[in-house]
């Protein structure tokens, strides 16, 4: 099934930002879809996450090609597909990034393990999207399944994944 990309008005949920250390070798941004928050906190968190996401995209690809594709595809490279899940007990991984120099050291796995443990303890599904096909198998190793793939006339695909509560 392919997720739809209709832009519906979305609720505001509690967002959390985690890092492996003060050096920010990795960051994980999650949204607890079961917990609503106030708008001021939401905009502060969103702004912080956007700035750091953009910084990671630029750092990972100095040619700015990936960053340019994200700007260009912003109207459909988003999480609106999660509306189809009809699941309020859900964590959504908004962003997971590891500094390229620190990759392959288990940092992402540690952050994911902690997220999965939290979700299991709270009987929650986890959803996420990735734009890197190589990441799909990585997430499958943690029990995620491809829910759908968003494609347009555009060189970037969005792989939508879920991990059911088990």
Residue ranges and their predicted role:
Residues 1-16:
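Single conserved hydrophobic/aromatic residue that forms the stacking wall/gate
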Residues 14-31:
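Conserved beta-hairpin
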Residues 27-97:
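Conserved acyl-donor/pantetheine-binding loop and adjacent beta-alpha core of acyl/acetyltransferases
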Residues 90-91, 118-131:
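Conserved GNAT acetyl-CoA-binding A-motif
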Residues 94-103, 127-136, 153-156, 164-165:
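Conserved beta-strand-loop-alpha-helix junction that forms the acyl-donor binding cleft
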Residues 95-98, 104-117:
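Conserved acetyl-CoA-binding loop-helix of GNAT-fold acetyltransferases
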Residues 109, 121-122, 132-149, 153-155:
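Conserved active-site alpha-helix within GNAT-family acetyltransferase domains
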